[in-house]
Design a protein with these regions (language model features):
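Metal-dependent nuclease catalytic cores that hydrolyze phosphodiester bonds in DNA/RNA
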Residues: 1-162
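Acidic, metal/cofactor-coordinating or nucleic-acid-engaging core segments within structured domains
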Residues: 185-209
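Short histidine-centered catalytic/ligand-binding loop motif
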Residues: 66-70, 176-190, 234-240
Length: 246
């Protein structure tokens, strides 16, 4: 499925196949900073030609429908972990997996100027999550390239005093989620390793108060096909998948 081109009013407009937002197109030798997101970085690894055509030539790939149910599970997980963050207590799944020494990281509060030019207080974790205008950012060496990405969560290992990169993943598969098979090379899950590595790289360049752990996790929730039917409720299994940062 692909979506049709619409304007901000929801009206159908001509689809030219070219990006009309010039700031998204890199001009050779430009002096202004240019942002490259985590998804674009992943595209560069998978298809350098696609990356070049999109960011330099301005070609637009067909849009895809948004997965709102996945977004909702992300939102609910963030609320759950934020409650643990506020109390600096390990999440129930961390306790279940023998990781009581890990808690959601409380990075404190900062002030952000919003689109209305108003100064607002934000939790720093929410700044890091907001990929559109903020997120994790790191200027690549002596260039004008800014690598940027919105992270789902950051945990703190209280034993090692290191920060842990975390991403939430939602799915519905009849197969059991397992550490042994999750990163099977025949599947697309391998790209999630790049995602975790990318976030860790950004954080290492941000000069944070703690070091960045080589351990990272995917918090995978898998929708279950249960015999009793829907009944206005979906049940999920929850699995922590470990990845050693490369």
């Amino acid at each position: 499925m692909i979506d049709l081109k619409r304007n901000t009013k929801g009206e159908y407009v001509e689809a030219t196949g070219l990006n009309s937002q010039k700031w998204r197109i890199y001009q050779p030798n430009q002096k202004d900073d240019f942002k490259i997101s985590r998804s674009r970085f992943g595209e560069f690894k998978d298809c350098p030609r696609c990356f070049y055509l999109r960011l330099v030539k301005g070609l637009q790939s067909p849009g895809m429908p948004q997965f709102k149910l996945n977004e909702l599970t992300d939102t609910l997980l963030k609320k759950e972990f934020d409650e643990c963050r506020k109390n600096q207590k390990p999440h129930r799944k961390l306790i279940e997996d023998g990781l009581e020494h890990i808690v959601p990281y409380d990075a404190g509060i900062t002030k952000i100027i919003n689109s209305k030019k108003e100064e607002k207080e934000w939790q720093i974790i929410d700044v890091w999550r907001e990929s559109k205008n903020h997120g994790l950012k790191y200027k690549f060496k002596d260039t004008n390239i800014i690598l940027q990405g919105g992270i789902d969560d950051v945990w703190l290992n209280k034993k090692t005093k290191e920060l842990i990169v975390v991403d939430y993943k939602s799915q519905a598969s009849p197969k059991e989620v397992s550490q042994d098979t999750y990163f099977d090379k025949s599947g697309y899950h391998g790209s999630y390793k790049t995602q975790l590595d990318f976030y860790a790289y950004l954080m290492k360049g941000m000069n944070l108060e703690y070091g960045i752990s080589d351990d990272s996790y995917l918090y995978v929730v898998n929708g279950l096909d249960v015999e009793e039917g829907f009944n206005a409720e979906i049940k999920f299994s929850e699995t922590l998948i470990h990845h050693k940062i490369e």
